[in-house]
Regions:
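Substrate-binding cleft of extracellular glycoside hydrolase catalytic domains
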Residues: 1-123
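Solvent-exposed beta-strand motifs enriched in subsets of small alpha/beta binding domains
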Residues: 57-62, 206-275
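Short Gly/Pro-enriched loop/turn and capping motifs at secondary-structure junctions
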Residues: 96-98, 131-134, 154-158, 170-173, ...
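Short beta-strand/turn micro-motifs composed of small residues
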Residues: 59, 128, 152
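Hydrophobic anchor at the start of a short beta-strand
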Residues: 55, 123-125, 148, 246
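Structural recognition of alpha->loop->beta junctions
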Residues: 77-91, 95-97, 136-163, 269-271
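Aromatic-lined carbohydrate-recognition surfaces of secreted/lumenal glycan-active proteins
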Residues: 120-135
């Protein structure tokens, strides 16, 4: 069993260099549009990655139908693009505006979101409370198809409901985070499963070609260019999606001595080598 946290804009500016946790689940956003991305998502993702903390994500739902849940999934995918997640991407269903839609509709919404994520190459799951999984959702159906993240803060919670991750408090305290934070346990090796399957932005390792061994299969490097900025961006995004390292160098010029001085000054300001 390992221990983790889940965070959103409500935790403010997190000092990830001080955070000690086995994993972190980040709120990517909410609703049906990519512009509803959590204001702290990019910063939290970069900070956790820099600190060496494995991450997953969740999308808070306001959907009222399976079609709206699919739209939420598409928005979520836009926000996740180009990133790598060692833990699942969860559909967070708990809003009071949804609770009277009925078990069939709510369960279908979970399926619509998760199926859309899975078709795009992500390991998807559902987050809800014990109450919702018992009274609002078809837990057995969902647990048979997706990973479950269950919230229950009681000491004597129902242990018979299947789950891989358990949110056990909303009152945790962790160095680097001001105020309270949700704490979770996890009993499944998600990083191993996800990376091996090539999901969540991690491309599958290619099989060696005939006549080459596994070491040779991963020995290729390419220098590409010159390329227009839009083309370079597409290539870099593709390489990162495959889990490959991109060492970028920029060639600028020809230019005047004045322009050269301005470029050198900016490179120095950014801490970049300029030759």
């Amino acid at each position: 069993m390992i221990y983790g946290i889940d965070v959103s804009k409500h935790q403010g500016m997190i000092d990830w260099s001080k955070v000690k946790t086995d994993f972190a689940i980040l709120r990517a956003g909410f609703g049906r549009y990519a512009y509803q991305k959590d204001p702290q998502f990019e910063r939290n993702y970069a900070g956790a990655k820099a600190a060496g903390i494995p991450v997953g994500a969740y999308w808070y739902s306001y959907a009222k139908s399976a079609e709206e849940a699919r739209e939420e999934a598409k928005a979520c995918l836009q926000v996740l693009q180009g990133k790598h997640f060692e833990f699942p991407i969860y559909f967070d269903i708990e809003d009071s505006t949804q609770e009277n839609l009925g078990k069939a509709v709510l369960t279908a919404m979970c399926e619509a979101f998760c199926d859309t994520l899975e078709k795009a190459g992500y390991f998807a799951g559902v987050y809800a409370s014990t109450y919702w999984f018992t009274h609002k959702l078809d837990h057995a159906r969902l647990a048979g198809k997706y990973t479950i993240w269950l919230a229950d803060y009681r000491a004597g919670y129902n242990k018979t409901l299947k789950r891989d991750m358990h949110q056990y408090t909303s009152k945790g305290h962790v160095a680097g985070i001001s105020g309270r934070v949700d704490r979770n346990t996890c009993t499944r090796d998600f990083p191993g499963i996800i990376k091996k399957a090539g999901l969540n932005g991690f491309g599958k390792a290619d099989k060696p070609l005939a006549g080459e061994n596994s070491a040779q299969a991963a020995s290729y490097t390419r220098e590409i260019g010159p390329a227009a900025r839009k083309d370079w961006t597409r290539l870099a995004d593709k390489a990162e999606a495959l889990g490959l390292r991109v060492n970028a160098k920029l060639t600028i010029g020809p230019m005047t001595s004045g322009d050269d001085a301005a470029i050198q000054a900016l490179a120095t300001e950014l801490g970049l080598k300029c030759t």
